[in-house]
């Protein structure tokens, strides 16, 4: 019987401990009703604010057409809105730094997708299926010493 008494004492101690408090994730909505998300691609980091509006997109205080020279960049950035059929329903303000134009485009795309997901959880399955919520983790491989590039080596001579 002493074994049973020890076990019940352990159970009582566990029950009397403070209850486990689960931390809920911080809401990513500010006072103005904007949804906030960050997107990353290569060395670029984009901070994106999304709010209900008329479809205006501002990147680093410039319009999207001024910031990105090619129309194909603009089309890929608008992909989440095309998939969710919400073109011209949200205004976007984003700041992006680091990397080149292609990396910045990918970071903005990732940030917009995450913000859209927060604004309406119904879009989660659509955006996930389109592969827009997954962070593209490919980065440039580092150069190794004794080689010309990351993989390129000097010409081998047998004699």
Swiss-Prot record:
GO cellular component: cytosolic small ribosomal subunit
Record-level Gene Ontology MF annotations: RNA binding; structural constituent of ribosome
Keyword Ribosomal protein: yes
Annotated Gene3D superfamilies: 3.30.230.10
Keyword terms of this UniProt record: Ribonucleoprotein, Ribosomal protein
Alphabetized PROSITE patterns for the sequence: RIBOSOMAL_S9
InterPro entries: Ribosomal_Su5_D2-typ_SF, Ribosomal_uS9, Ribosomal_uS9_bac/plastid, Ribosomal_uS9_CS, Ribsml_uS5_D2-typ_fold_subgr
Keyword presence, Ribonucleoprotein: yes
GO biological-process terms attached to the record: translation
Family to which this protein belongs: Belongs to the universal ribosomal protein uS9 family.
Protein name per the record: Small ribosomal subunit protein uS9
Source organism: Rickettsia conorii (strain ATCC VR-613 / Malish 7)
Upper taxonomic lineage: Bacteria, Pseudomonadati, Pseudomonadota, Alphaproteobacteria, Rickettsiales
Gene symbol of the encoding locus: rpsI
């Amino acid at each position: 019987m002493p074994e049973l008494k020890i076990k019940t004492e352990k159970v009582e101690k566990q029950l009397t401990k403070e209850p486990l408090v689960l931390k809920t994730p911080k809401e990513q909505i500010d006072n103005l009703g904007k949804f906030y998300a960050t997107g990353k691609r290569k060395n670029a980091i984009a901070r994106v604010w999304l709010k209900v509006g008329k479809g205006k997109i501002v990147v680093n205080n410039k319009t999207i057409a001024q910031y990105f020279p090619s129309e194909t960049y603009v089309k890929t950035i608008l992909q989440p809105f095309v998939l969710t059929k919400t073109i011209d329903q949200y205004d976007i303000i984003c700041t992006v730094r680091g990397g080149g134009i292609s990396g910045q485009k990918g970071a903005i795309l990732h940030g917009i997708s995450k913000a859209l997901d927060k604004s309406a959880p119904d879009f989660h399955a659509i955006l996930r299926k389109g592969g827009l919520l997954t962070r593209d983790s490919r980065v440039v491989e580092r150069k190794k010493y004794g080689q010309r590039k990351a993989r390129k080596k000097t010409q081998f001579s047998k004699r």
